[in-house]
Amino acid sequence: MVTIRLARHGAKKRPFYQIVVADSRNAATGRFIEKVGFFNPTAKGQEEGLRLDLDRVNHWVGQGASVSDRVAKLVKDAQKAA
């Protein structure tokens, strides 16, 4: 099953997440099909905290991909901001 989920990157105590489309059987930070955005929960000031390609997310959801709980909230926030 294809899932849209977060893949953690960054240093210790400085998380940075890529929003990826991946097969649910692969490791969380392993192989992915497509990168559709990023999320920086520690963004301050003028730094960009969230970038999401909503067209590609909607494409994958239309193809039957499931969305993780956290990514669903981020998509909702991005749609509200757009």
Swiss-Prot record:
Ribonucleoprotein found in the keyword field: yes
One example GO MF annotation: structural constituent of ribosome
Residue spans crossing the bilayer: none
Keyword ATP-binding: no
GO cellular component, one term: cytoplasm
UniProt keywords, alphabetically: Ribonucleoprotein, Ribosomal protein
One Pfam family named in its UniProt record: Ribosomal_S16
GO biological process terms held by the UniProt record: translation
PANTHER family according to UniProt: 30S RIBOSOMAL PROTEIN S16 (PTHR12919), SMALL RIBOSOMAL SUBUNIT PROTEIN BS16M (PTHR12919:SF20)
Similarity comment: Belongs to the bacterial ribosomal protein bS16 family.
Protein's recorded name: Small ribosomal subunit protein bS16
Gene source species: Vibrio parahaemolyticus serotype O3:K6 (strain RIMD 2210633)
